[in-house]
Amino acid sequence: MMPEASLPILLLMGPTCSGKTALAIEAAQTLPIEIINVDSALVYKGLNIGAARPTEEELALAPHRLLGFRDLTEPYSAADFRADALKHIEQIHNNGKLPLLVGGTVLYFKALVEGLAPLPEADPVVRAEIAALADAQGWPAVHQALAEVDPVTAARLKPTDKQRLQRALEVFRLTGRPLAAFHAEHDKTLTKSRDGLSQFSGLPYPVLSTALAPQDRAWLHEQIALRFRAMLNSGLQEEVEALRQQPQLNADLPGIRAVGYRQMWEYLDGMYGYDSMVERGIIATRQLAKRQFTWLRKWPELQWFDSNDRSQRDALFGLLAKNCKSVFS
């Protein structure tokens, strides 16, 4: 077996509803790999149906790390994910296996391979000041305040993106420097590649980057609609109603803002009718998939496989098997 520092990590990325989890579970049953979840909703406890959490039967066949371990009231950042993932990667390598990181939260994948800019810790006083501004004048006023000091970051954020707006303005008020300047200084990118594996300057391990995604976007949209309706039939409304019974939870928490949960929460708040909730949930999921494609198209040396083509899925499985064999043979 290779020295631990030379052992690769395997990335299986892709848009929502592309079949990543099913393929990963299949692979984990026959290959020397362990799965690490890379989905920002699935890190939270209590988000099951709407987050497409694997069933208990599936988890018995293929356990997932970083799954359902965080309380909904606890923030979980990309930096938190990177720190946790690196610990689990080392453990999996020590177990004589390869980590297969599976999910659609590309921000987490980027944080892992590129590292993160050194930013100041959250400051409760500054956050309270920004929250007071939002309460008094609305989040568009926060967006405008950010645009005046950090136009680059403001241009890529919507006035409704409360969490990121708050963080960007907080960073400026704490440091006097725009968030965009920190990111520009921290340009961690691909440094070299060999035998299909990439070496990123922010990570000590070689990386196999793969994506499972349909070429037919209409097919994906159909799958999104079918799955959202299946979630409703499986009890998504009851799941959210149970969450609403917990007084510490509210609609502004990151987990509750996840696609599907947000629309159901707002429906139960009486903001719109059931049919509108269904339509909004499906549209929001399509928009999520579009954003995921946008991120993935920028990923260096990403190997794409068509999730709607059995032979392509088999080829992806074969590539994972080949990398395992090259390490452990």
Curated annotation (Swiss-Prot):
Which PANTHER family does the UniProt record give? TRNA DIMETHYLALLYLTRANSFERASE
Q: How does it assemble?
A: Monomer.
Annotated region (Interaction with substrate tRNA) at 39-42, 163-167
Cite the HAMAP family for this sequence: IPP_trans
Q: Which SUPFAM superfamilies match?
A: P-loop containing nucleoside triphosphate hydrolases
Name what cofactor the protein needs: Mg(2+)
Q: Where is the signal peptide?
A: none
Q: What is this protein called?
A: tRNA dimethylallyltransferase
Species assigned in the record: Alcanivorax borkumensis (strain ATCC 700651 / DSM 11573 / NCIMB 13689 / SK2)
What is the role of this chain? Catalyzes the transfer of a dimethylallyl group onto the adenine at position 37 in tRNAs that read codons beginning with uridine, leading to the formation of N6-(dimethylallyl)adenosine (i(6)A).
What positions does the entry give for substrate binding? T16, C17, S18, G19, K20, T21
Family membership, please give it: Belongs to the IPP transferase family.
